[in-house]
């Protein structure tokens, strides 16, 4: 049985290096791996000894914490209906732009994100009790990247407007949902933190069964937003938008004169509980574990308008291409705006974990009972890699 357990854990630890996958599980035996310190010797006494003090029971560890999520499995968390203008029904020509909101099927409902990445570099500190329990925290910086179909971001615009003017009316609302495009965003590097606890619950020889619980938070701002759409392609550096604002947006939305906007930021929260089994083989301690986690990314459903000119230049305010192929702008004529997408905007919808369960595989290398390096990979609910290097005082 021992040989079988050794074989399974060693194979899992070595195979993890070939496939990488925001919170690590960690080695369940970590509280008891480093039993000596670089400044103070470890205490191996009996906790039930009446002569033992808390000074003998407590120790500190510090080190580097790196967590790199290459693909988090996320989906949108939105309502089934979305308020915008009626669908166009005219078979030819243009039509009067809608001015009232209608409840339509939300194209963002249940959408899966194509890519979600997060990279964290931090310092970690752990308070150890009786070489069995850890209470730890991390302080560092995180950055992220999100990519998805434009429908996930409710990219909308107005098409077929029959007005005789260089801009739409103030009460016009979008009537087209653009779902054949891609939206991606990059965040800046922002402060992040996490707290947690880990315990070695059961030990038998060299095997250890342990559990942990963690919580993490960060709130990075959106550094760059790219909309890759044939009908309305644009890029915004440090985008700003409207929170809690229904259609229609002000006509100055997207211009330098826009007011009432705020910076786009993403509030990231995650909690995780895990259970893992390890087996010590001299200086190597491979482990395998399962985890249950929930993550959310909330941007307050901020709506961001396409950048445009405050005043018309050559009778246009954006560089959106013609769609039906008119080829020119007919000034002072009906339908001069009908062949281009107008009042384009998108919103950053709330996202959450699409899968709650995952597995983690890793190994820890211990040197002189004072230093340790842990390498871990996580799969199923995310593809991530974790590196942890620490020492005991």
UniProtKB/Swiss-Prot annotation:
Chief location: membrane
Listed GO biological process terms: monoatomic ion transport; regulation of cell shape
Keywords assigned: Cell outer membrane, Cell shape, Disulfide bond, Ion transport, Membrane, Porin, Signal, Transmembrane, Transmembrane beta strand, Transport
GO cellular component: cell outer membrane; pore complex
Family classification: Belongs to the chlamydial porin (CP) (TC 1.B.2) family.
Summary of the function given for this chain in its UniProt record: In elementary bodies (EBs, the infectious stage, which is able to survive outside the host cell) provides the structural integrity of the outer envelope through disulfide cross-links with the small cysteine-rich protein and the large cysteine-rich periplasmic protein. It has been described in publications as the Sarkosyl-insoluble COMC (Chlamydia outer membrane complex), and serves as the functional equivalent of peptidoglycan.
Name of this chain's protein: Major outer membrane porin, serovar E
High-level lineage: Bacteria, Pseudomonadati, Chlamydiota, Chlamydiia, Chlamydiales
Name of the coding gene: ompA
């Amino acid at each position: 049985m021992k040989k079988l357990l050794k074989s399974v854990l060693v194979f899992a630890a070595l195979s993890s290096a070939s496939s990488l996958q925001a919170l690590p599980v960690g080695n369940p035996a970590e509280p008891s791996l480093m039993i000596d310190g670089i400044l103070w010797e470890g205490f191996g006494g009996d906790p039930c000894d009446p002569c033992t003090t808390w000074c003998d029971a407590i120790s500190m560890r510090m080190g580097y914490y790196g967590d790199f999520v290459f693909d988090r499995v996320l989906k949108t968390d939105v309502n089934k209906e979305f308020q915008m203008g009626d669908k166009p029904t005219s078979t030819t020509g243009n039509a009067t732009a809608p001015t009232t909101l209608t409840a339509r099927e939300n194209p963002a409902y249940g959408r899966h994100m194509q890519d979600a990445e997060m990279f964290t570099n931090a310092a970690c500190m752990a308070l150890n009790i009786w070489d069995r329990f850890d209470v730890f925290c991390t302080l560092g910086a995180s950055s992220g990247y999100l990519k998805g179909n434009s429908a996930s971001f409710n990219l909308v615009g107005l098409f077929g407007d029959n007005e005789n003017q260089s801009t739409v009316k103030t009460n016009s609302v979008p009537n087209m949902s653009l779902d054949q495009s891609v939206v991606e965003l990059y965040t800046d590097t922002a402060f992040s933190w996490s707290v947690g606890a880990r315990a070695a619950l059961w030990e038998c020889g060299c095997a250890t069964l342990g559990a942990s619980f963690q919580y993490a938070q960060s709130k990075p701002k959106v550094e760059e937003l790219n909309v890759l759409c044939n009908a309305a392609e644009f890029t915004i550096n440090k985008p700003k938008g409207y929170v809690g604002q229904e259609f229609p947006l002000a006509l100055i939305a997207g211009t330098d004169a826009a007011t009432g906007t705020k910076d786009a930021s993403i509030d990231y929260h995650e909690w995780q509980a895990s259970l893992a089994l390890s087996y010590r083989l001299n200086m190597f301690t491979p482990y395998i574990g399962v985890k249950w986690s929930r993550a959310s990314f909330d941007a307050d459903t901020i709506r961001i308008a396409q950048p445009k000119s405050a005043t018309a230049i050559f009778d246009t305010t954006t560089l959106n291409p013609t769609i039906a192929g008119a080829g020119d702008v007919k000034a002072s004529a009906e339908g001069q705006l009908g062949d281009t997408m107008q009042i384009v905007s998108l919103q950053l919808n709330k996202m959450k974990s699409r899968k709650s369960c995952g597995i983690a595989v890793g190994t820890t290398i211990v040197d002189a009972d004072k230093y340790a390096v842990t390498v871990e990979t996580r799969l199923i609910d995310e593809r991530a890699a974790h590196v942890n290097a620490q020492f005991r005082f």
